[in-house]
């Protein structure tokens, strides 16, 4: 996340610098003196310029051979959201969604380049598919004791509204006001007992009370993603299986080779060791 924030500032700076050849143009004016475009550029270049320049070089070189679709970016962003939570939201607030999408695209370009030489078997792909569970959407009513849970379940069995009862009874401050809605989630996002019970339910079905360390849950599944066929998911699965085998050193080595083969020539003398330094990291 810190890398994305840093890149956002410098990429914006470079775009600003490209708009005009007049580096003496003031971008900040004060009573004690102005700050010119050149001063700003040079200061940012000194602080983080080499790291961001390498990102720009990688993107330019890799995008000639590898393509990343909007759908792939969307899917990766969902994965990042699940991993980083509020940190991702903060990154979007500070940098904007466009910058985040560009950095995700670059990461995917590097990964695609690196996994190109990794082999996977049909057996590995089918095992991944068999273990894959699509996301589900569920609501729940959380209470502290089994007696209350059974009372609530009895009311539901008589046809009372789940959302209304969640607002009345649920002890979960994060979902009670929304009628118990937990949104979409996949495997590993809920405690084991909750997840196992939820995945057994059909859409619209309500569970018996489920005990966890948090109390007793009554779960209702409200929607389920349809699991695509193996052939429909095969390319996506192959990418994930290969990525799971990938290590950072292999990725860097492959990207370095592609950059070297592209004949990159850096004109700014202060940045000429960017590629050499990256290879040593």
From Swiss-Prot:
PROSITE patterns: PPIC_PPIASE_1 (PS01096), PPIC_PPIASE_2 (PS50198), PROKAR_LIPOPROTEIN (PS51257). It comes from the Bacteria. Residues 1-18 form the signal peptide. Its EC number is 5.2.1.8. GO terms for biological process: protein folding; protein transport. The keyword Transcription regulation does not apply. One of its GO terms (molecular function) is peptidyl-prolyl cis-trans isomerase activity. A lipid is attached at residue 19 (N-palmitoyl cysteine). Gene3D superfamilies: 3.10.50.40, Trigger factor, C-terminal domain. The keyword Coiled coil does not apply. It is a lipid-anchor. InterPro entries: Foldase_PrsA (IPR023059), PPIase_dom_sf (IPR046357), PPIase_PpiC (IPR000297), PPIase_PpiC_CS (IPR023058), PrsA_foldase (IPR050245), Trigger_fac_C (IPR008880), Trigger_fac_C_sf (IPR037041), Trigger_fact/SurA_dom_sf (IPR027304). GO terms for cellular component: plasma membrane. It is an enzyme of class 5 (isomerase). A lipid is attached at residue 19 (S-diacylglycerol cysteine). Pfam families: Rotamase_3, Trigger_C. Belongs to the PrsA family. Plays a major role in protein secretion by helping the post-translocational extracellular folding of several secreted proteins. This is Foldase protein PrsA. It comes from Geobacillus kaustophilus (strain HTA426).
